[in-house]
Structures are given as C-alpha cells and as structure tokens.
C-alpha cells in the first residue's frame, strides 16, 4: 500500500475514532497527512470528540497546534463543538489557548458563540484572554451579549475583573469618547426604579432592604427597569442624557447576594457588581448620539441648512448637465456643416469628371483596324459566279482588294 493510501486511511480512522486502526497504520509508516482543507487526523479526532484517538495521536507526535487552510487549530474544533475533555487534553498538552484563526477568533470566542459554558469556564481557568477581539471587533463578552447568555456573561465579567487587560484598544476605537467616572452601586431587588434613588433619602426594596442614600437631583427623563431570569437580577438603564453623577449610594451591611449586570443603552460596556465590591462604569458615546442630544430648536435649523445644501448641489448639477448638452449640440452642428461641405465638393468633382469624359468622346476618333489573317494557300479556285459576286461586293463597299501575291488565282468558266 502506498504512503498516500496509508495517509487517507489514517484520516478516516481518526474521523471514526478507531484507535487500534490508528496505531496499526502509524506502525506501518502512515504519514501525518491532511485533506484538501488542511485538516489533520488530530483535527478530526477533536472535532468528532474521540478522546482516546486524540490522546494516541498526541503521543505519536502529531502537531497540537496544526492549522487548517482557515488557520483553525484542533483546540478551535473541540471548543466549537463543546468537547470539554478534549479541550482540557489539548491545553494540558501545550496547545496555544489564545490561538486565532482567519477570523481572529480564539477558542473562547467559538465556545461562547455556541453556548458551551463548561468549555468557557475551562478556557478561563487555563488563562484564555477575555479581552481578545475578533476580526469583527468583538470580544467573547460582546458575543455573549448578542446571544443573551447571562451565565457566560457573569463568568466572563468576573474573569475581566480578575484579569489585566493587555489589549487596551479595539481594532476600530470609538472616536471622541465621553467618560463618566462617578461611581454608582445597585443592590438586589425584584423591581428597582432608578427615579426613587434620587427622589428621596430612604428607599425600600421588595427582596432586600437598601441603606440610606444621599439625595440627588431629579432625573430629567424617564427611566425604565427590567428584571432578568435564571436567578440573575438584570437592570437596564435608559439614560437619555441623564447625568449619572447624581446617583450615589453605599453598599449595605449585608452586601450583594448575587452579581448584577447593568447595561447602558447609550453606552457600550456592561457592568457586573459582585458582592462586597464597588465598581465604576465608563460610558462611551458616539458623535451621532451627541447630535441626537442637541436642543430641539437647533434641529430644524440644521435640517433647513441641510436642505439648502442639497438644493444647491442639485442646482449646480443641473447647470453642469445643461452646459454639457449645449456643448454636445454645438459640436453636432459643426459636424453637420462639415458633412454638407464634403458632399458639395464631391458633387462638383463628379460633374468635372463627366465633362472631361464628354470632351474626350466628341473630339477623338477611334480607329479600328481589322486584320484579316489568311491561311497560306497554294491555289484558290474561283468560279464565274463567285467572281461576279465578289465584284458586286467591291462595288458596294467602295473598296478595292488587292489579291494576294503569293496565291495564284485561276478562273474557270463553266
């Protein structure tokens, strides 16, 4: 059996998890080949969850960080399919936990994408970078937010608090950020209205009491609250330009029984407040959001100015089109005059040619010479009737014909 066939059989055995077949093929010299996508036997074993097969291949020396044509490693495969035991095997064998594929996604990204909580927990345990950003400028936390997976959100938030951020800038940083550094704290409760935080000094909650809070200024716009499910209290703050510096509290003596996730509608980040800790929230706003907060008086003026600019642009475009049309008409007239002039010149030249041909026909005689070829004959016998006829023809034509000197003519009378 050729090496190519041995390599193909090794790939198939790894795909099916046939440990004995894998050992036999490697003992017979089967090479560690890949298929047309660059998938190695270890990739297939990790993808299909064959723990013992992956262990055999790793002991045989297969590369633990082998790359496919899209730069995916066996760890990417195992994490995406939720094979936590193979993920642990690969990481313990020295696989790069932060390896990125062609989309700049790590194994943590893929595990979060497919809701594999155990894999996410294991990767964080082995030091996966929770601040890594993909090609689409998303971290694992952003993906968990999109998937609305609160368990993974809390897990990643705790890891972000315990891990130093070495990736300080995203791929596309937000221009002109606005930072609010005033600290604010929330405690547990079934339904929490933020307006009550600043309207009075004493606030009561349904499931846990709140300590006294300093009275702040009243909010300029309405606030909303949302209570999450699954054992987590989720508070959504709709700021609409509310100065968050007015909200100031202190932790109660009992602390917070469970983590909170506070999402800012006008911001980008999500805050989780664990028990016994004080956290600050940084809000980043875009320039478009700043424009939305302009006074209502300025908005019509800006709309009028925008309309005027658009009308001016349309008018200039129309003038340009009219100028181009006039120029095209002028050129067409020039071409038409030139064509008429050429036609007149051609007609004059034709008339001259006809006149010249007529003159040549009237003033020149055409001489036509008829050459008679007479075959060489020794003697010609002419009867009297022929001679009379010949004489008659000569009289009619008015011409005389000399007899040939070399031909003897004899007249025979009958």
Swiss-Prot record:
Q: In which tissues is it expressed?
A: High levels in thymus, spleen, kidney and intestine.
- Subcellular location, record wording: Nucleus
Which cysteine pairs are covalently linked by disulfides here?
none
Under the heading Pfam families, the entry gives: Ank_2
Coiled-coil segments, which residues? 310-362
In which ranges do the ANK repeats occur? 5-34, 37-66, 70-99, 103-132, 136-166
Tell me where in this chain the PTM Phosphoserine is found: 218
Which Gene Ontology MF annotations are present? identical protein binding; transcription cis-regulatory region binding
A GO CC annotation given for this chain: nucleus
UniProt keyword annotations, A-Z? ANK repeat, Coiled coil, Nucleus, Phosphoprotein, Repeat, Transcription, Transcription regulation
Among the GO biological process terms of this entry, one is: positive regulation of transcription by RNA polymerase II
* Residues making up the signal peptide according to the UniProt record: none
State if DNA-binding is listed as a keyword.
no
The record ties this protein, via Gene3D superfamilies, to: Ankyrin repeat-containing domain
Under the heading InterPro entries, the entry gives: Ankyrin-SOCS_Box, Ankyrin_rpt, Ankyrin_rpt-contain_sf
SUPFAM superfamilies linked: Ankyrin repeat
Q: How does it assemble?
A: Heterotetramer of two alpha and two beta subunits. The C-terminal is necessary for the formation of a heterotetrameric GABP-alpha-2/beta-2 complex, and also facilitates homotypic dimerization. Interacts with ADGRB2.
Question: What is the stated purpose of this protein?
Answer: Transcription factor capable of interacting with purine rich repeats (GA repeats). Must associate with GABP-alpha to bind DNA.
Q: Which PANTHER family match?
A: ANKYRIN REPEAT PROTEIN, GA-BINDING PROTEIN SUBUNIT BETA-2
Q: Please identify the protein, giving its name as recorded.
A: GA-binding protein subunit beta-2
Species of origin:
Mus musculus (Mouse)
């Amino acid at each position: 059996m050729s090496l190519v066939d041995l390599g193909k059989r090794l790939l198939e055995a790894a795909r099916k998890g046939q440990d004995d077949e894998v050992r036999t093929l490697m003992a017979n010299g089967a090479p560690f080949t890949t298929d047309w996508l660059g998938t190695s036997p270890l990739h297939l074993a990790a993808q299909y969850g064959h723990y013992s097969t992956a262990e055999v291949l790793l002991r045989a020396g297969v590369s633990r960080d082998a790359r496919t044509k899209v730069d995916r490693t066996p760890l990417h495969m195992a994490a995406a399919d939720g094979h936590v035991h193979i993920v642990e095997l690969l990481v313990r064998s020295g696989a790069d936990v932060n390896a990125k594929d062609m989309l700049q996604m790590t194994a943590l990204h893929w595990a979060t994408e497919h809701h594999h909580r155990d894999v996410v927990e294991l990767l964080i345990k082995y030091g996966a970078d929770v601040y890594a950003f993909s090609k689409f400028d998303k971290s694992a936390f952003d993906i968990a937010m999109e998937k609305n997976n609160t368990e993974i959100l809390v897990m990643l938030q705790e890891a972000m608090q315990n891990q130093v951020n070495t990736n300080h800038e995203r791929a596309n940083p937000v221009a002109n950020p606005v930072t609010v550094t005033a600290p604010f704290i929330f405690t547990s409760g079934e339904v929490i209205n933020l307006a009550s935080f600043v309207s009075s000094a004493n606030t009561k909650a349904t499931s846990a009491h709140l300590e006294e809070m300093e009275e702040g200024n009243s909010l300029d716009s309405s606030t909303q609250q949302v209570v999450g499910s699954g054992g987590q209290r989720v508070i959504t703050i709709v700021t609409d330009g509310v100065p968050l510096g007015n909200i100031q509290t202190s932790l109660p003596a009992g602390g917070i029984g469970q983590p909170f996730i506070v999402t800012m509608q006008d911001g980008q980040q999500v805050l989780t407040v664990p028990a016994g800790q004080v956290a600050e929230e940084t809000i980043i706003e875009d320039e478009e959001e700043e424009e939305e907060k302009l006074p209502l008086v300025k908005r019509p003026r800006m709309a009028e100015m925008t309309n005027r600019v658009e009308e001016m642009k349309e008018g200039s475009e129309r003038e340009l089109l009219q100028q181009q049309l006039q120029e095209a008409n002028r050129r067409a007239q020039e071409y038409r005059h030139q064509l008429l002039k050429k036609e007149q010149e051609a007609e004059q030249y034709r008339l001259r040619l006809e006149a010249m041909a007529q003159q040549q026909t009237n003033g020149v005689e055409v001489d036509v010479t008829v050459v008679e070829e007479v075959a060489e004959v020794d003697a010609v016998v002419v009867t009297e009737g022929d001679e009379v006829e010949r004489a008659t023809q000569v009289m009619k034509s008015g011409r005389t014909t000399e007899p040939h000197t070399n031909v003897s003519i004899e007249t025979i009378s009958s």
